[in-house]
Amino acid sequence: NTVDVLIVLGHQGLPGAMQTDAENDPEVQRPLDEDLHFCGAVPGINLYIAAHSHHGIEQAIVHPDTGTLITQTYGYGTRLGRVRLKVNDRRVVAHDIELLKVWSDELPPHAAVAARVAHYRQVIAPQIGPPLGRCTARLIRKYNRESPLGGLIADVMRARTGADVAVTNAGGLRADLPEGAIDRGHILDAFPFLNDTTTVELAGA
């Protein structure tokens, strides 16, 4: 009886696809089944802000059974969610929800954060080392199909092991490799896990 508006922050469902242009690719958009089920099973929630799936909701979903408003931004800070609620007698009588595009290259850096980033860049510089090579074009990831970066990783595995076939999971590719000089930092951004490469012999049948 002391709450005027109940807002729930959720983090469930399938993780967002590891693909740089995922928000522009309907093929990899994650379903909201778990969020919808939760909002239908728990009455009294005015606003549910979802996460984890990175499924941007441009217009709020109104749950048909409970009236809960459901929204979510895309991932990686590409949008800023803005919610305006008009409340009368503890009821949301109007709402306006927007996903605002964030153009990070147009924003000045925060001085304190920039200083800390610069400090840690100096700390890890010896581990990064000099450039290892160059990319003549950006090597991108795709989540549901073959990609240039995925092909490169698989080719490295084959070269290292002498295997006939190599397989890597798309979810383990966490960043594209940019055009230009590539150092160990770029490699760790793209493939940050301490995975073991394992060779097995399989029957052809």
Predicted region positions:
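Active-site neighborhood of phospho(di)ester-bond hydrolases with catalytic His/Asp-centered motifs
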Residues: 6-11, 45-56, 71-73
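Phosphate/diphosphate-binding loops
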Residues: 65, 70-72, 76-79, 85
